[in-house]
Amino acid sequence: FFASNPDGRVPDYHTDLGIYEEGCGLDKVDMSWGHDEYIYHVAKDYLPEEAGYMLRYHSFYPAHLEGEYQYLMSDHDKEMFKWVREFSQYDLYSKSAERPDAEKLRPYYEDLIAEYFPPQLAW
């Protein structure tokens, strides 16, 4: 599938840095677009920056679980990634077999959402 892509024959693209400069920052790196990036763009204007990092990068496991791609991160990225690592313990494999009482929890989450988000979002 990738054999016909001419980028595969450019030696500079086959280095750790590729087209990027060391320490350029993850905001300068083209990454695949998925649900994490989508919800980040929906919520970024309403949440603290730390929460934005958690939303945007919580599925970037090579970086926050394995410590990969440090050479692309800015000092600010490295600082913010402590929040991504903190969040990861509540993300994958943290589900309980016991179903929560949605009606009991609803007021808490409605208040939390109202604290950060306007009544209507631009989806």
Predicted regions located by residue number:
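Non-catalytic terminal regions of proteins
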Residues: 94, 113-123
